[in-house]
Amino acid sequence: MGKYPDCFPDNFEKDILPDGAQENSRRVYRIIKYDEKISRRNFMSTYEEVQLKLMPKPKRYNENEPSTYSTSCNTELSKIRYFLGLCMKHRPRAFIAVGTTDGSCGVSQLTSERTKSNGGHVDWWVYADAEPQIYFEKVE
Protein backbone atom coordinates (compact mmCIF):
# COMPACT_ATOMS: atom_id res chain seq x y z
CA MET A 1 0.00 0.00 0.00
CA GLY A 2 1.24 3.47 -0.83
CA LYS A 3 1.63 6.47 1.42
CA TYR A 4 -1.05 9.11 1.78
CA PRO A 5 -0.35 12.87 1.59
CA ASP A 6 1.71 14.26 4.48
CA CYS A 7 -1.03 16.76 5.33
CA PHE A 8 -3.47 13.93 6.24
CA PRO A 9 -3.94 13.35 9.98
CA ASP A 10 -1.73 10.74 11.64
CA ASN A 11 -4.78 8.58 12.41
CA PHE A 12 -6.12 8.63 8.84
CA GLU A 13 -5.42 4.99 7.93
CA LYS A 14 -6.34 3.59 11.34
CA ASP A 15 -9.46 5.60 12.22
CA ILE A 16 -10.81 7.33 9.08
CA LEU A 17 -10.08 5.23 5.98
CA PRO A 18 -12.96 2.73 5.55
CA ASP A 19 -12.23 -0.98 5.87
CA GLY A 20 -13.99 -1.66 2.55
CA ALA A 21 -11.64 0.53 0.49
CA GLN A 22 -9.53 -1.58 -1.87
CA GLU A 23 -6.89 -1.17 -4.55
CA ASN A 24 -9.12 -1.88 -7.52
CA SER A 25 -9.78 -0.57 -10.98
CA ARG A 26 -13.12 1.07 -11.83
CA ARG A 27 -14.09 3.04 -14.91
CA VAL A 28 -14.98 6.53 -13.65
CA TYR A 29 -15.50 10.12 -14.70
CA ARG A 30 -13.77 13.06 -13.02
CA ILE A 31 -14.19 16.81 -13.37
CA ILE A 32 -10.91 18.45 -14.34
CA LYS A 33 -11.06 21.95 -12.91
CA TYR A 34 -7.44 23.11 -12.63
CA ASP A 35 -5.31 23.88 -15.64
CA GLU A 36 -6.50 23.11 -19.15
CA LYS A 37 -5.00 19.66 -19.24
CA ILE A 38 -5.27 16.52 -17.17
CA SER A 39 -2.56 16.92 -14.52
CA ARG A 40 -1.81 15.48 -11.08
CA ARG A 41 -3.12 18.67 -9.51
CA ASN A 42 -6.64 17.71 -10.65
CA PHE A 43 -6.67 14.62 -8.42
CA MET A 44 -6.32 16.26 -5.01
CA SER A 45 -8.75 15.48 -2.23
CA THR A 46 -11.11 18.07 -0.77
CA TYR A 47 -8.89 18.11 2.32
CA GLU A 48 -5.80 18.97 0.27
CA GLU A 49 -7.66 21.68 -1.65
CA VAL A 50 -8.78 23.29 1.63
CA GLN A 51 -5.29 23.00 3.15
CA LEU A 52 -3.77 24.68 0.08
CA LYS A 53 -6.50 27.34 0.14
CA LEU A 54 -7.64 26.42 -3.37
CA MET A 55 -11.20 26.27 -2.07
CA PRO A 56 -13.07 27.35 1.07
CA LYS A 57 -14.25 24.73 3.54
CA PRO A 58 -17.53 23.25 2.28
CA LYS A 59 -20.59 23.69 4.50
CA ARG A 60 -20.66 20.02 5.50
CA TYR A 61 -16.90 19.71 5.97
CA ASN A 62 -16.09 17.01 8.52
CA GLU A 63 -12.52 15.95 9.24
CA ASN A 64 -13.74 12.58 10.58
CA GLU A 65 -15.58 11.74 7.34
CA PRO A 66 -13.65 9.52 4.88
CA SER A 67 -14.92 11.40 1.82
CA THR A 68 -13.18 14.58 3.01
CA TYR A 69 -9.88 12.91 2.13
CA SER A 70 -10.96 11.36 -1.15
CA THR A 71 -10.88 12.38 -4.77
CA SER A 72 -14.49 12.29 -5.97
CA CYS A 73 -15.35 10.41 -9.14
CA ASN A 74 -18.52 8.94 -10.57
CA THR A 75 -19.33 5.85 -12.62
CA GLU A 76 -22.25 7.67 -14.29
CA LEU A 77 -21.53 10.26 -16.97
CA SER A 78 -24.96 11.91 -16.55
CA LYS A 79 -24.27 12.66 -12.88
CA ILE A 80 -20.83 14.09 -13.55
CA ARG A 81 -22.29 16.29 -16.31
CA TYR A 82 -24.72 17.75 -13.76
CA PHE A 83 -21.86 18.62 -11.40
CA LEU A 84 -19.84 20.05 -14.29
CA GLY A 85 -22.65 22.54 -14.86
CA LEU A 86 -22.40 23.66 -11.25
CA CYS A 87 -18.61 23.77 -11.35
CA MET A 88 -18.46 25.90 -14.51
CA LYS A 89 -19.96 28.87 -12.66
CA HIS A 90 -16.64 29.18 -10.82
CA ARG A 91 -14.32 27.35 -13.21
CA PRO A 92 -15.46 28.04 -16.79
CA ARG A 93 -12.71 25.93 -18.35
CA ALA A 94 -13.56 22.77 -16.39
CA PHE A 95 -14.16 19.59 -18.37
CA ILE A 96 -14.82 15.88 -17.88
CA ALA A 97 -12.23 13.13 -18.09
CA VAL A 98 -12.78 9.38 -18.16
CA GLY A 99 -10.37 6.80 -16.81
CA THR A 100 -9.80 4.20 -14.14
CA THR A 101 -9.15 4.24 -10.42
CA ASP A 102 -6.03 2.20 -10.95
CA GLY A 103 -5.15 0.32 -7.77
CA SER A 104 -1.51 1.37 -7.98
CA CYS A 105 -2.67 4.95 -7.38
CA GLY A 106 -4.75 4.33 -4.26
CA VAL A 107 -7.74 2.58 -2.75
CA SER A 108 -11.33 3.32 -3.76
CA GLN A 109 -14.86 2.49 -2.72
CA LEU A 110 -18.37 3.14 -3.98
CA THR A 111 -19.76 5.64 -1.47
CA SER A 112 -23.00 3.62 -1.36
CA GLU A 113 -21.08 0.70 0.19
CA ARG A 114 -20.76 2.63 3.47
CA THR A 115 -23.56 5.22 3.36
CA LYS A 116 -27.25 5.29 2.51
CA SER A 117 -26.53 7.15 -0.71
CA ASN A 118 -27.26 5.62 -4.06
CA GLY A 119 -25.72 6.22 -7.41
CA GLY A 120 -22.27 5.86 -8.79
CA HIS A 121 -20.22 8.21 -6.60
CA VAL A 122 -16.76 6.78 -5.94
CA ASP A 123 -14.35 7.88 -3.23
CA TRP A 124 -10.73 7.40 -4.30
CA TRP A 125 -7.97 7.91 -1.74
CA VAL A 126 -5.01 8.71 -3.98
CA TYR A 127 -1.49 7.98 -2.75
CA ALA A 128 0.87 10.94 -2.43
CA ASP A 129 3.35 9.66 -5.02
CA ALA A 130 0.73 8.37 -7.48
CA GLU A 131 0.24 9.65 -11.02
CA PRO A 132 -3.50 9.04 -11.59
CA GLN A 133 -3.65 11.45 -14.52
CA ILE A 134 -1.96 8.93 -16.81
CA TYR A 135 -5.06 6.73 -16.61
CA PHE A 136 -7.45 9.48 -17.81
CA GLU A 137 -8.37 11.20 -21.05
CA LYS A 138 -10.67 14.05 -21.95
CA VAL A 139 -14.28 13.23 -22.81
CA GLU A 140 -15.15 14.96 -26.08
Report each predicted region and the residues it spans.
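Conserved NAD+-utilizing ADP-ribose enzyme module
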Residues: 1-69, 77-140
